[in-house]
UniProtKB/Swiss-Prot annotation:
It comes from Saccharomyces cerevisiae (strain ATCC 204508 / S288c) (Baker's yeast). Residues 690-701 have a biased composition (Basic residues). Protein involved in bud formation. Functions redundantly with BOI1 to promote the fusion of secretory vesicles with the plasma membrane at sites of polarized growth. Acts as an abscission inhibitor during cytokinesis in response to chromatin bridges. Residues 557-570, 600-609, 702-732, 1015-1024 have a biased composition (Basic and acidic residues). This is BEM1-interacting protein 2. Keywords: Cell cycle, Cell division, Exocytosis, Phosphoprotein, SH3 domain. Its main location: other. Present with 688 molecules/cell in log phase SD medium. Pfam families: PH, SAM_2, SH3_1. Residues 266-330 form the SAM domain. The lineage of its organism: Eukaryota, Fungi, Dikarya, Ascomycota, Saccharomycotina. Residues 1-39, 365-412, 437-478, 491-744, 943-986, 1007-1040 are annotated as: Disordered. Residues 43-107 form the SH3 domain. Disruption phenotype: Leads to the accumulation of secretory vesicles and impairs bud growth.
């Protein structure tokens, strides 16, 4: 194809072009169906594809559906608003569209027909152009368009039109062969450099995943250069001689090596390639690579888990789950076939140590993967054994748990050195095809240094000859895994047949006799201990990582002691000098290692006692052992040997205070069976009953507590009766056992804890007591009784005596953080009972602090104490004293208030207060001065008004007296009452005079008499009125 013109991205370009128009004009960026010249600018922008549907809301916008290719004409460089102007190549329309609805199609290399044909063909019926042009990813701008998923291209809606010619819906054979020929030519031209699929290896990983996972629609086109590793696809069809040695890569993975039997070791990329190879869509298959699903995780996936991988279609999830089940079945079938093949192989294979092979692995997919042990490749080269490394199909294989030892007939000769020998018992076990076909996988064989079987354990050989290279390898190689009854029968076989079987040796034969070195027996898993078929047989069990050095195991719950002879001790030291095991602290909670020879004693004990668990070469730690955190001390071999001679058991940190007498508390008389004819360093095996006695005698009791207890018991015996002394001794003994059975909690600095019960007389205790007196106290038992005691209070220490003649305190109560409350409604029965028995009518109680309180730690037992007294004054006195004592204010800690309003410091507040006081004083002085001025002004006004009022009053009085005299004179001279009443009424009318008022009767003479004159004006008015009425009166009298 020529590069001078633009190649179409999809077949849906410009379908409205007439037949006489050249196709090159249609595909040219200079051509625009609408005559717009803006199309010439579109060549500078990348191609976009619509990922969401958008309907235009205005005329100048552009409709697009998912999968539409958008040719950008103008971006938003001018406005920066996210709206681009482009052309939809499907509808050939131009307009504005939101760029967030589209995705950029990246460009990495000029298009090649080989790469274009490797993508999925999409042929559209919208054009009758050449199908080759319609099915390729095109143009310089979008040649290697890496789409997240190829589905949106297929879902692009089509525009219906009337076809001008017959539509070719299927690719013709001629075009297909032409495509193949062109691809071969381009392959020869590009053979110098790597294919373009590897160009994006260093680029965006998200884009490269889809780019590399697209399945070729034409077989044999996705090929690599000749120097890359040869691969082949499951659907490879060889085209010609040049492609016979070339294969199709899927996701960059060689599909020929994707064997479902090896699915456990697949990487996420290989899983993706496998499902693409099986015909699943790229989107679903790529989910395994996206979520990093390795082979081990794949085999553990269930149907519900596939939904978490964003595989939305249920049908696809179900088909993938069925494919996973097929892979599992292939693995199981291959494991059984390998076991059958090992049975029919030649005889010399049994003299070689086989590598791990595939077995029944269904259980391993359900659990977590154990940490990989040190492999054979990591062994030091100076051990005279260099194993052949196992050929792996990938150097960077994922870590996995090595399989148990089985005998693979196909890989044995190629991988194992012929001089490595195994014992005869392995040959017998190898013949049993059902040995490892069990619901559980056999335990992982640990490699050197093995934490489960230390090299220093004297399990090699009794001889003192230096070990041979085969013996060295037997210590370093993965040990043999025995399961179920085979393990037991193997040990029983040699314990019964070989009379020279040493108690500390697991080798049935020496080097000279048997000629085969036996690897040390591994510690099987914890739950594979029980042998239900034969109870009397010896079973070996232990946790994998819990076998300590010989002689250094902590005591189990039954306190079994391991025994050893002097010959075994010398051999043990020699073995430790030969092999040096690095120390490890994670395997510190080990189990007891008992001797195999003690099995006979255990069998003898069965006839006399109830059968117990037998000793074994690798005895497991008992479940009832509560000291799992005891750590084993690691030291040099010399110190270990010396400490081994001194004692046969290891003291844990919690038993450091035990003495030799405590350790030897169980005498031979108590345990007649446990003694053994051994050297002085051998210890007896103690049975359960005696071990309990010895443990109870070896409890952690401090000297101070023991002394206090002894003194208390002696004094109680002296001060009380015989029955009380016996009773008290029993109770004290019980409290001592409780104290020693569990460590006593740490006491704070309370006076009760510091001093304890004092030997002091009552009189001396009363001298410095805060309060003292007789009270009745309720007992603590179920049938509690009230007893009268003499109490003395010293701080928070409330002690009491049984009588005033006692020289030692009878009891003690620590009332720290207690509350003192009177007896309420719920305590009426207690109060009533105390009153009825004559112990006191007034009852109150002491309540201990709430559980969980930080101040709730007291020396005495926290419980409610009831007290009763005879009168109210005594109760108030005791309650007041107790309340004052229990008030606990810690002045060393600042008080934090819940008031959230911001405040100022104390010094600032004091300064502000002083200023405020000064301002207040000034303000008060000003107010006083102003008040004095106001008071003076008001006083002057009042005085002036008073004077005026007095003057007016005096004038009014004089006026009234004068008018009274005149009236009396007129009464004497005039006999008519109307005239006098008229004169009086006129006077009371404030100067208003009218004959009509008198005539109408509105004014009466009494008004003038009762009214007083107001002011000096009325005097003048009165005279005028008198003159007026005087003439009138004279005139009327004359008439009458």
């Amino acid at each position: 194809m020529s590069n001078d013109r633009e190649v179409p991205t999809l077949s849906q370009l410009n379908t409205t072009v007439s037949r006489d128009k050249d196709v090159s004009d249609t595909l040219s960026p200079d051509f625009d169906s609408k005559g717009s010249a803006t199309g010439r600018d579109g060549g500078n922008f990348p191609m976009y594809i619509a990922i969401n549907e958008y309907f235009k809301r205005m005329e100048d916008e552009l409709d697009m559906k998912p999968g539409d290719k958008i040719k950008v004409i103008t971006d938003d460089e001018e406005y920066k608003d996210g709206w681009y102007f482009g052309r939809n190549l499907r509808t050939n329309e131009e307009g504005l569209y939101p760029v967030v609805f589209t995705q950029k199609i990246t460009v990495e290399k000029a298009p090649t027909l080989m790469r274009a044909k490797s993508t999925k063909r999409i042929y559209s019926p919208l054009t009758n152009e050449d199908p080759l042009l319609s099915s390729t990813f095109i143009s310089e701008n979008d040649s290697n368009s890496e789409l997240p998923t190829p589905q949106p291209i297929e879902t692009a809606a089509s525009i219906s039109r009337t076809a001008n010619g017959k539509i070719e819906r299927n690719l013709s054979l001629k075009n297909t062969m032409s495509d193949i020929d062109n691809a071969l030519l381009e392959f020869k031209d590009d053979s110098i450099g790597p294919p373009d699929r590897f160009i994006n290896s260093g680029r965006d990983e998200e884009h490269s995943i889809t780019h590399e996972t697209i399945l070729s629609a034409t077989d044999g086109l996705d090929v690599v250069e000749s120097n890359s590793k040869p691969t082949t696809s499951s659907s490879t069809g060889f085209l010609n001689g040049d492609l016979e040695n070339q294969a199709t890569l899927i996701n960059g993975i060689d599909t020929t090596k994707l064997n479902p039997v090896e699915a456990e070791f697949w990487s996420p990329e290989e899983i993706t390639a496998y499902f693409i190879m099986e015909g699943y869509d790229v989107q679903s298959a790529s989910r395994f690579q996206k979520h990093k699903i390795s082979g081990k995780i794949l085999l553990e996936l269930e149907l519900v888990h596939l939904k978490e991988l964003d595989i939305n279609s249920f049908g696809t999830r179900f088909e993938i789950f069925k494919e996973i089940e097929k892979i599992k079945e292939a693995i199981r079938t291959n494991g059984r076939s390998l076991n059958r093949a090992s049975k029919t192989n030649n005889a010399n294979i049994y003299n070689q140590l086989m590598p791990p092979a595939n077995v029944d692995q269904r259980a391993s997919y359900r659990g977590h993967v154990r940490k990989t042990s040190q492999s054979l490749e990591d062994l030091p080269s100076q051990q005279n054994f260099i194993p052949t490394p196992r050929n792996t199909r990938n150097s960077s294989a994922s870590k996995h748990r090595p399989k148990s030892l089985v005998f693979d007939s196909q890989e044995a000769n190629a991988n194992i050195a012929p001089d490595v020998q195994i014992p005869q018992v392995v040959e017998e076990m190898a013949g049993n095809e059902n040995l490892f076909v069990s619901p559980r996988r056999a335990p992982k064989p640990p490699s050197y240094p093995s934490p489960a079987q230390p090299p220093k354990s004297p399990l090699l050989n009794n001889t003192r000859t230096s070990p041979s290279p085969a013996q060295l390898y037997s210590w370093q190689s993965p040990t043999l895994s025995f399961s179920g009854p085979k393990r037991t029968s193997y040990i029983d076989q040699y314990s019964s047949s070989d009379s020279n079987f040493n108690s500390r040796s697991a080798l049935p034969k020496n080097n000279q006799g048997g000629g085969k070195a036996l690897s040390p027996i591994p510690s099987p898993t914890r739950n594979s201990v029980r042998n239900e078929d034969s109870e009397g047989k010896l079973t070996s069990s232990s946790k994998r990582n819990s076998v300590p050095y010989y002689g250094y195991a902590p005591e189990s719950s039954s306190d079994r002691k391991s025994s050893c002879s002097s010959h075994e001790e010398e051999q043990f030291q020699e073995t430790m000098n030969t092999f040096e095991r690095p120390t490890s602290s994670i395997y510190a909670d080990g189990s007891t290692i008992a001797s195999i020879s003690n099995d006979k004693l255990a069998h003898e004990k069965e006839g006399k006692k109830k059968p117990t668990r037998h000793s074994s070469s690798l005895s497991s730690k008992s479940k009832s052992d509560s000291r799992r955190n005891s750590s084993l001390k690691r030291s040099s071999s010399a110190s270990r040997t010396s400490s081994f001679k001194k004692s046969s058991f290891m003291l844990s940190p919690f038993r450091q205070q035990f003495t030799d007498n405590a350790a030897r508390s169980s005498s031979p008389e108590e345990n007649p069976i446990t003694s053994m004819p051994s050297e002085k360093n051998s210890s007896p095996i103690v049975d359960k009953k005696s071990s309990k006695k010895s443990r109870s005698k070896r409890r952690s009791v401090s000297a101070k507590e023991a002394e206090i207890f002894t003194e208390t018991v002696k004094d109680d015996k002296n001060k009380r009766s015989a029955s009380e002394a016996i009773k008290g001794e029993t109770l004290k003994g019980k409290s001592l056992r409780q104290m020693t059975a569990r460590p006593v909690a740490k006491k704070k600095q309370t006076s009760a804890f510091i001093e304890g019960l004092r030997s002091i007389s009552v009189k001396e205790a009363m001298k410095d007591a805060d309060f003292s007196g007789w009270m009745s106290k309720k007992g603590s038992g179920a049938m509690s009784t009230w007893k009268t005691r003499f109490f003395t209070l010293h701080g928070t220490r409330l002690s009491y005596f049984s009588s005033t003649t006692d020289t030692r305190e009878r009891g003690l109560i620590d009332i720290t953080a207690h509350r003192v409350v009177p007896a309420k409604e719920d305590d009426k029965l207690v109060s009533l009972y105390a009153a009825s028995t004559g112990k006191g009518r007034y009852c109150f109680k002491l309540l201990p602090p709430q559980p969980g309180s930080k101040k709730g730690l007291t020396f005495t037992q926290p419980r409610t104490h009831y007290f009763a007294v005879d009168n109210k004054e005594e109760m108030r006195g005791w309650m007041a004293a107790l309340i004052k004592t229990t008030i606990d204010i810690d002045t060393s800690v600042p008080i934090i208030s819940s008031y959230t309003t911001p405040t100022v410091s104390l010094s600032k507040a004091q300064e502000m207060l002083a200023e405020a006081r000064e301002e207040t004083k000034l303000r008060e002085q000003q107010m006083l001065e102003n008040e004095e001025d106001e008071d003076q002004f008001l006083w002057d006004q009042q005085q002036l008004q008073q004077q005026q009022h007095d003057n007016n009053q005096g004038q009014a009085d004089r006026t009234i007296s004068a008018s009274t005299q005149r009236t009396s004179d007129e009464d004497n001279t005039i006999s008519t009452p109307n005239l006098s009443s008229a004169n009086n009424t006129t006077i009371g009318s404030n100067g208003f005079s009218s004959p009509f008022l008198l005539a109408s009767g509105l004014l009466s003479p009494g008004v003038a008499r009762n009214s007083s004159m107001r002011g000096t004006e009325k005097k003048g008015k009165f005279s005028t009125e008198e003159d007026y009425f005087g003439d009138n009166s004279k005139h009327k009298t004359d008439k009458i």
